[in-house]
């Protein structure tokens, strides 16, 4: 377990520096873990996993160490949701509902009811909000 903690302590600064979407990262890491990757593709794969991360070579080395630990991609997929109720989508659904249109509410609910299974047509529910989007403020603690 201590090896895992040491590795995560090295990973988290890369994610923070790149302002990575953590939910998407864990999903992509499970995909990466399941797919064969040769040494030549390692840097490209690191850049895909954490776009904008400093030290892509260091991240590629981290990924190689991660893969060498033998993580189970099926277990990773089982605990890392593809879809979460993201603030911008909640705001969109609530705004439409206030106008009497529950379509967005139903669609968002459909996405998060089965959050671990990627499905065609739900891609936007897996994406982070716009980088220039206004902060979402809630008053009910959700």
What are these regions (language model features)?
Residues 2, 6-142:
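Regulatory N- and C-terminal appendages and interdomain linkers associated
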């Amino acid at each position: 377990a201590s090896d895992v903690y040491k590795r995560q302590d090295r990973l988290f600064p890369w994610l923070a520096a790149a302002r990575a979407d953590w939910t998407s990262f864990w999903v992509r890491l499970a995909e990466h873990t399941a797919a064969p990757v040769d040494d030549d593709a390692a840097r490209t794969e690191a850049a895909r996993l954490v776009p904008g991360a400093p030290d892509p070579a260091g991240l590629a080395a981290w990924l190689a160490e991660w893969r060498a630990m033998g993580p189970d991609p099926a277990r990773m997929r089982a605990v890392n949701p593809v879809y979460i109720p993201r603030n911008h989508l909640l705001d969109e659904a609530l705004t439409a509902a206030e106008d009497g249109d529950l379509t967005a509410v139903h669609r968002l609910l459909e996405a998060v009811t089965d959050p671990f299974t990627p499905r065609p047509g739900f891609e936007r529910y897996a994406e982070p909000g716009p980088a220039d989007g206004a902060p979402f403020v809630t008053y009910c603690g959700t």
